[in-house]
């Protein structure tokens, strides 16, 4: 082979190599398996930077695996703060980009929220996960076609917007819709009406469309995410009692504790004086936190028939979070007792419960 031919072949391989790699057949993975293999948590957004481990938050495995179930068209997650619900969304986005590309419409409550999430969460994920960095060009690259609110990749485009942006919601075809903090969305996208209905209309031409709706709960009677949960399988994260072997949800009403308080500069300061325990709803046995954290747990559906409609819904509070000791939850509750607005925040973000105005 002539030298010029060798050079030409080398240049051709260099030019088409990246494109060929991008069109490799997808791996046979669920979202959880993909995240365990490819996702890295970024140091500026995680206290546990490094490889993602689904075993750290086992309650996220089932919602992630539901995304690759062909019978599931929509996933609803109602969750307290700091349990990893944003990581659920990010893992799904990463999986789509790498394994099952298509147009994604990712919606935050406002455009400001969208820009912030893109800079602080999506950009670091792409930067630190090699398979994503290889497919999504840096916005600083000339002619990359990418901005803070739009990320192109082979086979698709990620559009990041706010529920108050009628133009994006009404004009962007999307196979995938992911809606974050649904209960904080605008009532109407400008004059166009319900933002979720506008977003869903963008999926009309996709036979394989999927939607993910995520939020902390807010006010009883006006919570969009609670309404969506009711239409799904209504699954609760339940732990096995070490005494009777039955499964039960760890909720605040079944948490037992003793405490004292004293006033310092006119303010009540609380102290937990003994172990915090959980009462099994089946046998009544009192089990300490350290034992319950080691017990097997699983999702149990209250409305399993909804699976036939393609909607799986999950509800999770902070008692199962590996980052939130029960004592912290109890103290936050006690400290908020004299302030209804603070108590409302505790109900929504820690207890994972709807607040009922009295």
What annotation goes with each model-predicted range?
Residues 2-358:
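Phosphate/NTP-binding elements of NTP-utilizing enzymes
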């Amino acid at each position: 082979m002539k030298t010029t031919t060798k050079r030409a072949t080398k240049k051709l391989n260099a030019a088409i190599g990246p494109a060929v790699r991008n069109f490799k057949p997808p791996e046979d993975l669920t979202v959880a398996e993909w995240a365990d293999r490819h996702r890295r948590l970024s140091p500026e957004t995680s206290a546990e930077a490094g490889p993602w481990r689904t075993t750290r938050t086992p309650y996220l495995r089932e919602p992630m695996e539901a995304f690759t179930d062909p019978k599931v068209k929509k996933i609803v997650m109602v969750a307290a703060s700091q349990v990893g619900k944003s990581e659920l969304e990010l893992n799904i986005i990463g999986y789509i980009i790498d394994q099952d590309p298509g147009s994604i419409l990712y919606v935050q409550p406002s455009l400001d929220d969208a820009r912030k999430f893109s800079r602080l969460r999506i950009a670091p994920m792409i930067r630190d996960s090699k398979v994503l960095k290889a497919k999504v060009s840096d916005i600083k690259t000339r002619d990359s076609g990418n901005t803070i609110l739009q990320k192109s990749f082979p086979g698709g485009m990620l559009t990041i917007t706010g529920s108050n942006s009628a133009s994006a919601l009404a004009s962007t075809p999307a196979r995938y819709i992911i809606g974050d903090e649904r209960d904080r969305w605008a009532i109407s996208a400008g004059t166009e009406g319900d933002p979720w209905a506008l977003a869903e209309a963008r999926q009309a031409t996709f036979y394989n469309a999927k939607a993910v709706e995520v939020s902390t709960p807010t006010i009883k009677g006006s919570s969009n995410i609670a309404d969506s949960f009711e239409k799904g399988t209504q699954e609760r994260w339940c732990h096995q009692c070490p005494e009777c072997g039955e499964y039960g949800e760890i909720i605040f009403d079944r948490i037992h504790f003793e405490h004292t308080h004293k006033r310092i500069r006119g303010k009540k300061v609380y102290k937990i004086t003994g172990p915090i325990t959980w009462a099994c709803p089946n046998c009544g046995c009192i089990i300490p936190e350290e034992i319950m954290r080691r017990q097997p747990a699983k999702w149990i559906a209250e409305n399993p028939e909804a699976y036939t409609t393609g909607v799986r819904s999950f509800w999770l509070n902070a008692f199962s979070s590996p980052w939130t000791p029960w004592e912290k939850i109890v103290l936050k509750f006690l400290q908020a007792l004299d302030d209804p607005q603070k108590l409302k925040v505790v109900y929504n973000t820690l207890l994972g419960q709807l607040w009922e105005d009295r």
